[in-house]
Amino acid sequence: MLKPVVTAILGLLLMGSSGALPAGCDRGERVQLLLEAKRRDASGQAMDKAREVIERRLGAAGASDVTVVRQGPNRILATFGGARDTGPIKALIGRSARLDFWLVDTSVAPGQAAAGEAPPGSRLLAVPGDGPDGRIAVRGRPIVNGTMIVDAQQSFDMSGQPTVTLRFDPPGTRRFARATSANVGRPFAIALDDAVLSAPNINEPILGGEAMISGDFTVESARELAIALRSGALPFDFVVVEERVVKR
C-alpha cells in the first residue's frame, strides 16, 4: 500500500492552496509572496539558508526576475514573474522537502507499529496511504539524507513510468554503499518530511551513488519533486501570509 502514498504526499508538497493570478495580471507585472516561518524561534542563520533555498527553487521552477529578501526576524518576501498559477509555486517554496533513507526495523510487527510501539533506538514514520494508523518502524539514524544529494532529475523506469533519479555526493555514495552491502534482502524506507514514500527491498549492493524513487508519479509531479530536492531542504516550513501583484 506504499506506492499510492507518493501521490498523496506530492499533492501536499506541490499543489498546496491553488490560486490563479488576479484578473488583469500581465507581463508587466510580478507576483509578491510574503512568507512566514512556522517556527517563531527561527535563527538568523536558518532564515538566511531558507532565503537561499527559496531563491533556488523559484529559479529552478522557471520563474523570472526573481528577488528574495528577508523581512524581519521570521518573514521572507519573494517577488517573481513568469507564473500564471501561483498554487504550485506557493507549495513548492513553502514545504521543507527533507528526504531521508532509513533501514526498516523488521523486528517490529505491523500491529506493534500501528499501536505506536517501537523499541529503543527505533522510531515510527507515518505511511499515509495505510490510513490513520499506518506506520513503519525505522532504525537508528538515516543512512543518507537530502543534504548529500548533488543532483535530482525526473526520469522514467523500464516500464515508462515517471520516476526521480538521485545522485549522492562522495560521502553519501560511500555511506549508501556500506549500508546496502550490509543489508541485502532487507527493506529500507524512503521518507519525505517524515512520511514514507516507499519501502523497497535491497536486492543488491548499490555502489554507484545513484538511487531511484518510483511510485504513482506524473511527469510534472516527478519534475517538481526533483526541483525541490536538488534545491535543498528548507530548515522549516513556511506559510504564505500575503499575496499581491505589483508593477515591474
Task: Outline where the language-model segments fall.
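Conserved structured catalytic cores and adjacent interaction surfaces
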Residues: 244-248
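Bacterial N-terminal signal peptides that target proteins for export
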Residues: 1-9
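N-terminal Sec signal peptide cleavage junction
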Residues: 17-20, 25
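Non-transmembrane, solvent-exposed regions of membrane trafficking/translocation machinery
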Residues: 27-29, 34-202, 206-207, 211, ...
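Hydrophobic alpha-helical segments of integral membrane proteins
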Residues: 12-15
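Catalytic P-loop NTP-binding/switch module of NTPases
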Residues: 217, 221-226
